[in-house]
Amino acid sequence: MFKFNAEVRQSQGKGASRRLRHNGQIPAIVYGGSEAPVSIVLNHDDLNNAQVHDAFYTDVITLVIEGKEVAVKAQAMQRHPFKPKLVHIDFKRV
C-alpha cells in the first residue's frame, strides 16, 4: 500500500506550478465523492519512485492531507516529454 504526505496548495497558476516543480514538488488535485476538489502538493521523488510499480496504478493510495487520511486512486498523470519527471497528477477519491 502506498501512503504519501500532501499539503494543500495555496497558490494557483502556471508560475506557481513551475516554482513547485523547480523545488522538487508536484502539483496535484484530489476530486470525486461528495467533497469539493482540493489542490495539493506532493514530493516528486516519493511519487516518482512509487509510480514505477504496477500496483501504484491499480491499488488504493492513502494521502495524508492536513492530518486527515484520504483514500484515492491515480486517475491521470502528466509526464515531461523527455525527462523522467512527473508534471501533474489527478487523484480520484474512492
UniProtKB/Swiss-Prot annotation:
Residues 1-20 are annotated as: Disordered. GO terms for cellular component: cytosolic large ribosomal subunit. GO terms for molecular function: 5S rRNA binding; structural constituent of ribosome. The keyword Metal-binding does not apply. InterPro entries: Rbsml_bL25/Gln-tRNA_synth_N, Ribosomal_bL25/Gln-tRNA_synth, Ribosomal_bL25_short, Ribosomal_L25_dom, Ribosomal_uL5_bac-type. GO terms for biological process: translation. It comes from the Bacteria. The keyword Protein biosynthesis does not apply. Keywords: Ribonucleoprotein, Ribosomal protein, RNA-binding, rRNA-binding. Part of the 50S ribosomal subunit; part of the 5S rRNA/L5/L18/L25 subcomplex. Contacts the 5S rRNA. Binds to the 5S rRNA independently of L5 and L18. NCBIfam families: PRK05943.1 (NF004612). This is one of the proteins that binds to the 5S RNA in the ribosome where it forms part of the central protuberance. Belongs to the bacterial ribosomal protein bL25 family. This is Large ribosomal subunit protein bL25. It comes from Pasteurella multocida (strain Pm70).
